[in-house]
């Protein structure tokens, strides 16, 4: 990673810790001597914040209907002729033995010349089960299995950085193990990069779930994805605002990605962080009208692990970029600086305080407490009522619109249960805060392959495979491995127990 960039290796700088301590002390003093005044100011600030956040997202969503993702018509694909620049595909793997077969089958369906393609499967050297599955797949070029040193931090961005060092393609894309990209996605990305300005260094493909009907959780999750990738991100790109990347199907100009320094290995939402750095450099992200199919989390525990990691990463990213607010405003511009506050700062804060506000509302309805009533003078009360009623309606309407955009019409009625989903978000947010203090760089693994494939997997073609080793040993810089003992043991004895991963 580029040493000139701030990193999440340190959660709080001394300056941030000092400011935080001063704010806490000031709050304690106000609570001690001016309890009601402080409470009213706090209630007014929260109410106003909700109103601003709701208005911001409403404007973005309405504008999204005017301009969708970047489309690549058939004639533009045909206009490429035989020109196919080299392309690198990075796939970080850890404990993915169950999905390796389908992953390989999906990547083999990519409509791109094999001699112009480099597919790097990045696997930690002590992940015996996944290595055995890769061995069974009997891979041939353009597949390469790169053994990664299982060293700290054991995160996806660290592994991606090692892949970036090895990448030989003019363009580069990152996929997750459960991804099923459309076969022509690489060609569409090439055509889009060809017609877009050089300042566009990243294309985010649309993500959709292939199992939206599994249960209530997947229905709500799929609708959320519909609003995010089909509405919010295209609108952000249209207004040239910072775009929070998804963790997969990010297509890059490789040279620009290297110039940025790759990913922050200590940030558990490295995609969000990278999207902000792209904006700070004056570069742009666009959304590509090509779909990558993913597996929606169908189990609450698995969903909470994933969402708490995302929210922890949002807080990490906010703290990293706000270490120098004046520099951030100068590099982003005032408009984009304010958008950053709404997109990155307000997201975890809203999830954290939602249950507190719901609790206050319920307590007032049940008890009629005069103390709670005094917290909300008439001006604050009416703004709060409008924000609560209209805001909740609008967010449910967003989810219904997401269902319509994805043709999940049967799921629309279930969006009325969205408050249950928001409650789960709040639980995940508080879990994220606790984990940020205790284990800031811990990567909670999301289990894949929990839902049966909707279509049968394509049989992998047999061939020869061996781990990529240079001069009979793994280089000590960690590019294709690191600690030789761990790597050689994984290659020789694939029955050893797995003891590591993206943590």
Question: Model-flagged regions — what are they?
Answer:
Residues 275-293:
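Catalytic donor-sugar/metal-binding loop of nucleotide-sugar-dependent glycosyltransferases
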Residues 135-141, 145-165, 169-170, 183-268, ...:
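Long helical/loop segments within the catalytic core of UDP-sugar-dependent glycosyltransferases
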Residues 268-274:
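Acidic donor-binding loop at a coil-to-helix junction in glycosyltransferase catalytic cores
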Residues 108-152:
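Acidic donor-binding segment of Leloir-type glycosyltransferases
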Residues 55-115:
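N-terminal signal-anchor transmembrane helix
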Residues 27-57, 63-71, 75-79, 342-438:
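Membrane-embedded multi-pass helical conduit in multi-pass membrane proteins
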Residues 85-88, 118, 258, 273:
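Cell-envelope/extracellular polymer assembly enzymes that use nucleotide-activated donors
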């Amino acid at each position: 990673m580029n040493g000139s960039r701030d990193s999440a290796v340190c959660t709080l700088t001394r300056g941030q810790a000092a400011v935080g301590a001063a704010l806490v002390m000031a709050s304690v003093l106000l609570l001690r001597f001016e309890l009601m005044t402080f409470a009213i100011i706090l209630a007014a600030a929260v109410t106003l914040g909700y109103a601003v956040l709701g208005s911001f997202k409403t404007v973005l969503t309405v504008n999204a209907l005017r301009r969708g993702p970047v489309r690549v018509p058939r004639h533009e694909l045909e206009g490429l002729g035989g020109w196919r620049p080299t392309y690198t595909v990075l796939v970080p793997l850890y404990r993915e033995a169950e999905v390796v077969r389908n992953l390989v089958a999906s990547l083999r369906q990519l409509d791109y010349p094999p001699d112009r393609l480099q597919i790097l499967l990045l696997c930690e050297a002590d992940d015996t089960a996944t290595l055995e599955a890769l061995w069974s797949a009997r891979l041939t070029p353009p597949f390469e299995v790169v053994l990664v040193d299982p060293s700290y931090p054991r995160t996806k961005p660290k592994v991606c950085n090692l892949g970036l060092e090895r990448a030989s393609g003019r363009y580069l894309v990152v996929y997750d193990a459960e991804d099923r990209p459309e076969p022509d996605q690489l060609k569409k990305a090439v055509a889009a990069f060809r017609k877009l300005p050089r300042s566009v260094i990243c294309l985010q493909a649309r993500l959709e779930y292939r199992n939206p009907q599994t249960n209530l959780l997947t229905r709500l999750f799929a609708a959320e994805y519909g609003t995010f990738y089909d509405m919010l991100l295209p609108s952000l790109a249209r207004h040239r605002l910072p775009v929070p990347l998804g963790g997969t199907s990010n297509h890059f100009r490789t040279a620009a990605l290297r110039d940025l320094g790759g990913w922050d290995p200590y940030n558990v939402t490295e995609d969000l962080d990278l999207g902000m750095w792209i904006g700070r450099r004056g570069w742009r992200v666009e959304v590509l009208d090509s779909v990558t199919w993913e597996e929606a989390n169908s189990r609450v525990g698995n969903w909470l692990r994933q969402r708490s990691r995302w929210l922890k990463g949002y807080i990490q990213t906010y703290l990293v970029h706000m270490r120098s607010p004046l520099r951030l405003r100068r590099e982003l511009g005032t408009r984009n600086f304010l958008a950053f506050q709404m997109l990155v700062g307000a997201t975890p804060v809203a999830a954290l305080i939602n249950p507190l506000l719901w609790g206050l509302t319920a307590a007032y309805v049940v008890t009629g407490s005069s103390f709670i009533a005094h917290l909300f003078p008439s001006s604050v009360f009416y703004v709060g009522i409008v924000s609560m009623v209209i805001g909740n309606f609008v967010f449910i309407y967003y989810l219904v619109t997401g269902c319509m955009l994805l043709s999940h019409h049967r799921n629309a009625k279930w969006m009325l249960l969205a408050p249950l989903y928001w409650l789960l978000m709040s639980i995940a947010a508080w879990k994220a805060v606790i984990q940020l203090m205790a284990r800031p760089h811990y990567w909670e693994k999301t289990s894949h392959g929990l839902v049966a494939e909707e279509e049968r997997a394509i049989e992998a073609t047999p061939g020869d495979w061996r781990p990529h080793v240079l001069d009979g040993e793994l280089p000590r810089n960690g590019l294709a491995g690191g600690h030789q003992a761990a790597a050689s043991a994984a290659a020789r004895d694939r029955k050893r127990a797995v003891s590591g991963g993206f943590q």
